[in-house]
């Protein structure tokens, strides 16, 4: 069966010109999505599942651009939203589409929010929290024409408090829209798939598309000291990293024993051995301290910190630096842990 059969000739022509062939996730997802049924697509990051969800929606909307907000995309991470908005530019430009795209997150200014209400885009990219705010204000009227809701990275919220709030928001949206909307869930490999499907469908029938494949993992545990009982002494310059809000106890001396003096050069060696590296840490304070220490050891800016407390413009700038190869390392919190397209990261 031709996976592109449900798309318009123009969309098929653009896709075949831009890509060699559909990915397995796209081949499995497009026929299911084309039926109008609720669908959950499970596939690993980089499998093209986001385009699988969007291309059918764009194809439908392109027949009547400017008719108001009809496609809603929800993801749990602001950085992912802006990444998706950038990645949509290619297909829309390639199709010569007049469809408009808006982003509504906690970073959106009041002026931009008013403009979204006054002139709703055809496609709105948002977060669960911003969707809740839209539904509990007069702005919910812009959602009446929604026909399709794409729920990305649903495995990250299913079974959590955020997931419960999102599920409630979707049911509220059902009462606002003019007719029932199609739900398309996108998930990384997660088991059991049926449970994630129940979350996406809200108890309604849903078609499960399992395009999950187990990737070959290259895992290595590295301990930068031969004997953990013989940690070197460290000065106050590299004092132990504490969680946010935790202060050093009184009586702490300038010299203590820590593994960090051995970790810093080991991480720097890995950074220098690769074109691009992302180091994940547990909190904002550690991301900033580790990036600063790497730069100090390298005597050059080789690393930048990335976390949710940075302004949106700063986060986007830092992400673009890594993508362009202008900086070899990002030290990030969970702000980059989901399926963001960072290009070729070694």
Predicted regions and their residues:
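Helicase motor core with emphasis on the C-terminal RecA-like subdomain
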Residues: 1-13, 21-28, 34-47, 52-346
């Amino acid at each position: 069966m031709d996976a592109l059969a449900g798309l318009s000739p123009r969309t098929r022509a653009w896709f075949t010109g831009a890509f060699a062939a559909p990915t397995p996730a796209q081949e499995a997802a497009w026929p299911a999505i084309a039926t109008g049924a609720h669908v959950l697509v499970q596939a690993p990051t980089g499998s093209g599942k986001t385009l699988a969800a969007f291309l059918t929606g764009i194809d439908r909307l392109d027949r009547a651009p400017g008719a108001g907000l009809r496609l809603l995309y929800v993801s749990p991470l602001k950085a992912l939203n802006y990444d998706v908005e950038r990645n949509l530019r290619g297909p829309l430009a390639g199709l010569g589409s007049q469809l408009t795209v808006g982003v509504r997150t906690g970073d959106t200014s009041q002026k931009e929010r008013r403009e979204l209400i006054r002139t709703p885009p055809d496609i709105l990219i948002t977060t669960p929290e911003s969707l809740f705010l839209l539904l509990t204000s007069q702005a919910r009227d812009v959602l009446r024409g929604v026909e399709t809701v794409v729920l990305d990275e649903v495995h990250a919220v299913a079974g959590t408090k955020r997931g419960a709030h999102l599920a409630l928001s979707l049911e509220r949206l059902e009462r606002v829209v003019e007719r029932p909307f199609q739900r398309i869930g996108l998930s990384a490999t997660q088991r059991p798939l049926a449970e994630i499907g129940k979350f996406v469908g809200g108890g309604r029938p849903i078609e499960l598309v399992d395009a999950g494949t187990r990737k070959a993992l290259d895992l290595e545990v590295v301990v930068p000291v031969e004997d953990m009982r013989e940690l070197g002494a460290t000065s106050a310059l590299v004092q132990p990293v504490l969680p946010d809000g935790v202060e050093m106890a009184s009586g702490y001396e300038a010299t203590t024993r820590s593994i960090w003096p051995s970790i810093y050069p080991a991480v720097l060696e890995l950074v220098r051995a690769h074109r691009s590296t992302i180091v994940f840490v547990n909190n904002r304070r550690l991301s900033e301290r580790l990036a600063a220490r790497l730069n100090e050891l390298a005597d050059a800016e080789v690393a930048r910190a990335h976390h949710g407390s940075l302004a949106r413009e700063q986060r986007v700038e830092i992400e673009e630096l890594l993508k362009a190869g202008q900086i070899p390392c990002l030290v990030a919190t969970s702000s980059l842990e989901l399926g963001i397209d960072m290009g070729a990261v070694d």
